[in-house]
Amino acid sequence: MRLIPSRLSYLFLHLFAFCYYAQVTIQSPPNFTQHVSEQSKVTDRVSRRLIRTYQLYSRTSGKHVQVLANKKINAMAEDGDVHAKLIVETDTFGSRVRIKGAETGFYICMNRRGKLIGKKNGLGKDCIFTEIVLENNYTALQNVKYEGWYMAFTRKGRPRKGSKTRQHQREVHFMKRLPKGHQIAEHRPFDFINYPFNRRTKRTRYSGER
């Protein structure tokens, strides 16, 4: 008779273990889509970045976006113009990018009035754009800091205020083109971009080197 309590305890223990295992197995898997969405909104200072070089052809002006030495931005450049060559750096593993003129080194940014300006330091969110591929195969560039405001140019190639732009407007539509004379094989697929380290990025980098 003394064996009965011990057997009951043994059975209850097995039943508890079975219930726990069943509860763990029916839990929903991690939401990878949500993780990607959240991480795409945060600047990635650790991963290797993709750098591309191309021109942006404006649908309305029929010419190319250029970054001038006086920090002005317009869409009046001819194909192959030295100021139309743009260096595009990925900000995250999503579709956020920084765009700067290869000749001047100024980043294309947007101020609080919606005006496009050139800046030497492109780390702020006002200098980050989200690439949106449209159904007509054109690309729209929405500013990250001022959501709903797009890079846009008039028929004469003058920049249009971001507050007056919408995704369906022709003024915000662009087409990527290789610089004149450049071949696809000439592009370096990856490169490193140096950012100021904070304590967290230092710790992550050092742990990866061990």
Curated annotation (Swiss-Prot):
Its main location: secreted. SMART domains: FGF (SM00442). Residues 1-27 form the signal peptide. GO terms for molecular function: growth factor activity; type 1 fibroblast growth factor receptor binding; type 2 fibroblast growth factor receptor binding. The keyword Amino-acid biosynthesis does not apply. InterPro entries: Fibroblast_GF_fam, IL1/FGF. CDD domains: beta-trefoil_FGF8. The keyword Signal applies. It comes from the Eukaryota. Disulfide bonds: none annotated. One of its GO terms (biological process) is cardiac ventricle morphogenesis. Keywords: Growth factor, Secreted, Signal. Disruption phenotype: Morpholino knockdown of the protein causes a dramatic loss of cilia in Kupffer's vesicle. Transmembrane segments: none annotated. Monomer. Homodimer. Belongs to the heparin-binding growth factors family. Plays an important role in the regulation of embryonic development, cell proliferation, cell differentiation and cell migration. Required for Kupffer's vesicle ciliogenesis. This is Fibroblast growth factor 8. It comes from Danio rerio (Zebrafish).
